[in-house]
C-alpha cells in the first residue's frame, strides 16, 4: 500500500480524483501533511520525494528524520528527484549516512530530470563534479548527462562572453568614485569568476566522458 502526501489541499484533492479514476483507492491512501510529518516511523520502506528544489528536499528529509533514522543498511530506499540544487541533496545524503546506489537522468521537452536512489550506507567523499553532476552518471558516461553538459557549456560560454565583453564599458559607466559603483563592479567580477569556475568544471567532466 502507498501513502501519498501533500501540504496543500488543492493538489491533494486532485490526486484523490486521479486515484479514484484509475481504481486504486484501496491501494493508495492520501494524507494532508507538511513533508513527512504525518508518516509514522516504520510505516514505509521506500520514500519518494519529487517535483521540488533540492533545498526543500533536504528540509523535508531533515524534519522527517523520524521516518528514516532507524533504517537498516542497504534495505529501505529513498527515491529523490530534486529539480535544482542536486549537489546539496548529494551532500546531505552523504552527511546523514546514506549511500547513493544509482542515478538516472531523463529529458522531456527540453528539460532535464535527475532521479537518485539511496539507502543507508557509507558513501566515499567525492569531487566537486561528483556532487554537481552525479558520480554514477559520470562513471556510466550517461548520454543524457553528456547532452546536458554540452547545453550548459554553450549557455555558460554565451553569458560569460557577454559579461566579459561589456566589463570594461560597465566599469567606466558604473564606477563614479562611489561605494555603490564599486559594489556593482565587485558583484559583476564575482559573477564572472563563478561562471568561469563552472565552465572549467563542465569541461573537466566532459573530458572524463
Predicted regions, residues:
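Glycine-rich, N-terminal phosphate-binding loop of Rossmann-like dinucleotide-binding domains
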Residues: 51-52
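S-adenosyl-L-methionine
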Residues: 5-45
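Conserved S-adenosyl-L-methionine
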Residues: 1
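Class I S-adenosyl-L-methionine
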Residues: 37-43, 55-209
